[in-house]
Structure formats: structure tokens, C-alpha cells
Amino acid sequence: MSNAITMGIFWHLIGAASAACFYAPFKKVKKWSWETMWSVGGIVSWIILPWAISALLLPNFWAYYSSFSLSTLLPVFLFGAMWGIGNINYGLTMRYLGMSMGIGIAIGITLIVGTLMTPIINGNFDVLISTEGGRMTLLGVLVALIGVGIVTRAGQLKERKMGIKAEEFNLKKGLVLAVMCGIFSAGMSFAMNAAKPMHEAAAALGVDPLYVALPSYVVIMGGGAIINLGFCFIRLAKVKDLSLKADFSLAKSLIIHNVLLSTLGGLMWYLQFFFYAWGHAPIPAQYDYISWMLHMSFYVLCGGIVGLVLKEWNNAGRRPVTVLSLGCVVIIVAANIVGIGMAN
């Protein structure tokens, strides 16, 4: 395995670790509605940071974006909006299925759809099947899916042992939402694929290869921001128990506390895709679809590790922890299989 591919896998791991941890600051926010908290963090992660980073990277910010036709920008934007819909469904999936089953089904579907649909859309899936390296990477995707399933099973055992139940368990409704979440969340993978002309244009302007994907986030996350912020603002306006004015009428010190924590959560959310771009850069072009598989499987891996570090599994007993550890090992093996396949 080449050093470049190894570093690509490493940066995907760092990005996934940030994704697994980003919600921790949000949990410390006090006396704010979820909608206000999510909006403040979202403005930072989906608007301020993508625009600021792009302004630093590009020699002429406006000239870069105005150089693209609507036919180039619109698919990127719409796939970003597609991801935004999946993002909202994610929370509802947890509500009706519980954390473990919800995450397992949603992540499993988005891993498959986001990883395999890209080469199918590009018309080169047959090349993957017909080459040794391609077959190896596809095997890695299958092993990663097995690893996600094992970690999901560990979560179910933990919830059963600790008496944790879904907020409003509804299998039929939860499964529909999980499938929708999995499919729509893959929009981020499709957006990255559609944004290749933007990456190439950034490279032509002299942007470092590690950073060429970052300017496209202005458009991708702009689509996601409209969906997420629109959802939050509509609820803040329509739901009687929610009030943006009330949330910002608290003591000044508490408002500052909440804004800082929401900003930190937004920064950590953005960093997952900052490092996703770094991890994506050294991946060979014919295997760029693998980036999504690495990100999602590492997200599950890091989520399990973070849970152990935060002692969330202390009262779960030995069996759930053993199953979790097995799942984490399987995901690590999957990453190595994919790396070897890409090296071939």
C-alpha cells in the first residue's frame, strides 16, 4: 500500500472521528431549543466556514464561482439539498427505532448507496468487477458493511441490558425513515462526484491538491443549509412551545455559553468534511467512490470508540463490549482490504 493511499485512509479516519464527536458540545447547551442550537451550529458549519475557507484558498472568489454554468452548479447544489433531507430524517429515525437499530440501518444503506451508485452512474462499475483491485475494494465494502452490522448488534445488546428504548418505537414508520435517511444522506457522496469540474478548476488555479474539494462545499453545504435551516426556522415560527426570541432572552452569560458551544459543535461538524477532502485527494481516480465507504464505516468505528472512552458502555456487561470490539476490528480489516485493493 502506497504512502499516499495510507495517508488518505488516515485523514478519512480523522474526519470520521470529528464526526463521531461533534455532537458532544451540543449536549452541553442549556435552555435552548434543539432548533435554535442546530441553526447556530449550522450557520457556522454550512455557511461561515465553507465561505471563509474558500475565500482564503481562491485567488478570486467571485470569478471562480461565476465561471461555472448553471448546469454544473445545479446538480451539486441539489445533491447537497438531498443530503440535507437525509440529515433531518436521521434524527426522526433515532426517534422511532432507537439509536442502535436506527444508526445501523441508516448508515448501512447510505454506505451501500453512496459507495456503489457513484461508479454505476459514471458507467465504470463493470471495470471494478473485472479487475483484481476493483474486486478487492468491493470486498472491502462488503466487509465494512458486516462490521457496521456487528457494531449495530452490540448497540442493541447494550440497549437491552441497560433498558434503553426508542422514544416512540414504531417499526414500520422507523424503517421507512431509515431507508429514506440512508438514500438521501448519500447525496453528499453524489455531490462530491458532481463537483469534480469544480475540483479541477480549483487545481488549475494553483490550489493545493489537498484543498481542491473545499471550494465546492460552498455550493454543496449551501444546498444542505437551506433544507436544515428552513426546517428549523419553520418549526421555530409554527410550533407554539418554540421561540427564537425566548432562547435569546436568557442571561447574557448563558447565551454566550450556548453560542460558543454551538459554534464549537459546528466547527467539529465542518472538520469531518475538511479532512474528508484531504482523505479524498490521494485516492486513485478509479477508486474515488471508496471515500464514502471509508468515511461512513470509520464514523461507526469512532462512534463505538468514543462511547467506550466516555464510559457509556460501563454498565452494559462484557458481551456487548466484546461484540462492539469485534465489529471495530472488522471495520479496520475492511479499511486495509480497500487500501490493498486501491494499491493494486
Curated annotation (Swiss-Prot):
Reactions catalysed according to its record: L-rhamnopyranose(in) + H(+)(in) = L-rhamnopyranose(out) + H(+)(out)
Domain of life assignment: Bacteria
- Cellular compartments annotated: Cell inner membrane
Keyword entries, A-Z = Cell inner membrane, Cell membrane, Membrane, Sugar transport, Symport, Transmembrane, Transmembrane helix, Transport
Listed under GO cellular component are: plasma membrane
Q: In what way does this protein cross or attach to the membrane?
A: Multi-pass membrane protein
Cite the GO molecular-function annotations of the record. Answer: rhamnose transmembrane transporter activity; symporter activity
Q: Does the keyword Transmembrane helix belong to this entry?
A: yes
Q: What is its main location?
A: membrane
Family annotation (Pfam families): RhaT (PF06379)
For this protein, the parts annotated as crossing the membrane are 4-24, 38-58, 68-88, 101-121, 137-157, 175-195, 214-234, 259-279, 290-310, 323-343
Q: Briefly, what is this protein's role?
A: Uptake of L-rhamnose across the cytoplasmic membrane with the concomitant transport of protons into the cell (symport system).
Q: What is this protein called?
A: L-rhamnose-proton symporter
Source organism per UniProt? Escherichia coli (strain ATCC 8739 / DSM 1576 / NBRC 3972 / NCIMB 8545 / WDCM 00012 / Crooks)
Q: What is the lineage of its organism?
A: Bacteria, Pseudomonadati, Pseudomonadota, Gammaproteobacteria, Enterobacterales
